[in-house]
Amino acid sequence: MKIYLNYLVKVLITSPCSASVIIQYGIKSWPIWECEPSKFQWNYDDKEICLIIEGQAKISTQNGYIYVIKAGDLVEFPAGLNFEWEITKSIKKHYRLGG
């Protein structure tokens, strides 16, 4: 398991997310969001935790950091940050906002 943490933007990626974490947090019961390949800006008003089920995306921060997230990754985005999403392969994720 690899964990990537950037202290400037506080994005946490756990790759791959373990089955025990998925069960512990009830991730499979979270809502699902899907998107076809595209590029768009997104502002996180609330913290988001998501599990990428399918696909891949490149996420760029305002200060130039680029992350590639893919199926199996658990990603935590802090509130208050702006990102550019570039969906490179149709993506599907479970997500939870807040807390």
Where is each model-derived feature located?
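Double-stranded beta-helix
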Residues: 3-10, 29-31, 92-99
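Transition segment at domain starts
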Residues: 3-24
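Conserved short histidine dyad/triad with adjacent acidic residue
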Residues: 16-18, 26-45, 78-79
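Short histidine-centered beta-strand/loop micro-motifs
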Residues: 23, 40-44, 61, 67-68, ...
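Short hydrophobic/aromatic-rich beta-strand segments that constitute the beta-sheet cores
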Residues: 42, 59, 93-96
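Short, conserved beta-strand element in jelly-roll/cupin
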Residues: 44-59
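Short acidic-glycine-tyrosine-enriched beta hairpin
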Residues: 63-79
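Ligand-binding loop in jelly-roll beta-barrel domains
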Residues: 79-99
